[in-house]
Amino acid sequence: MTTYSDKGEKAAAFYCSKMGFEPLAYRGLETGSREVASHVIKQGQIVFVFSSPLNPGNKEMGDHLVKHGDGVKDIAFEVEDCDYIVQKARERGAKVVREPWVEQDRFGKVKFAVLQTYGDTTHTLVEKTGYTGSFLPGFEAPRVKDSLLSKLPNCGLEIIDHVVGNQPDQEMLSASEWYLKNLQFHRFWSVDDTQVHTEYSSLRSIVVTNYEESIKMPINEPAPGRKKSQIQEYVDYNGGAGVQHIALKTQDIITAIRHLRERGAEFLAVPSTYYKQLRENLKSAKVRVKENIDMLEELRILVDYDEKGYLLQIFTKPMQDRPTLFLEV
């Protein structure tokens, strides 16, 4: 997951101190990269890259930052046959931003290619068969180690569960069809505005996934309501379609959120009336929540449930000044 930022080093440090990540790799002037500095961080199997332009002539990154602010530019997929996927995607009409190319260092070779998806977002295909480096060719170990990080509590975030892309009205279907057509994904789940709505706003959503269902990409669009929806607000502030939030999975959300709050991570406020209503609703529900509701209320963790089971979730405040990208645990 690559985010463009005009302060990549500071953004990476923020995610490390507040969200429990650790520095993994670096590329910049010291490593021979004259155009872009990239700071790579990792937690569990989650890898984020924060990239910043190094000179005023970098029009592509400059234009992206002016239009969108700090935000996700690229979602990388590790693949087994980069050439085949690019060939099939091109035959089906996908825009190939960059044809397959190879980079190498003493740890081996890696093949890449880049495809265009919704908005200005791209997917980099990464074929790294046999590569033994800690990240990718051209990157080195972080130059500086923050001694404070080892003193902070572990957060236990493990993998990326899903990545949500928000679209302008009437563009959800074409964005989701792109994945079905070009990457051979299939539809996993969908809802319309009769199913997800409040008195004031609503949304439509289609979730697409790969064959193994290990990658899930919800695609949302706003639906008409009495007030501007969260989806429309995102589209307005982002200057079009883009990644709205990244969901990170943990096996122990109680400990994770307690530790994240101790680190200073900020989450959306939840009124106490939510938990009062939740207790009432659960009395007649078929599902039984094993966690202590008082504990969930203390940490402001939400409960989403139906007759098949439940999940616990919480949303951060926006991770930058614009009310665009946020995280879900």
PLM feature spans:
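An N-terminus-focused feature that recognizes amino-terminal "leader" regions
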Residues: 1-142, 162, 169, 296-297, ...
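Short, structured motif recognition centered on aromatic/hydrophobic residues
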Residues: 1-5, 15, 21, 41, ...
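Active-site-adjacent "gating/activation" loops or surface patches in catalytic cores
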Residues: 54-55, 212-231
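Active-site-adjacent structural elements in folded domains
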Residues: 58, 145-150, 192-193, 225-233
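Long compositionally biased, domain-poor regions of proteins
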Residues: 215-217, 238-319, 325-329
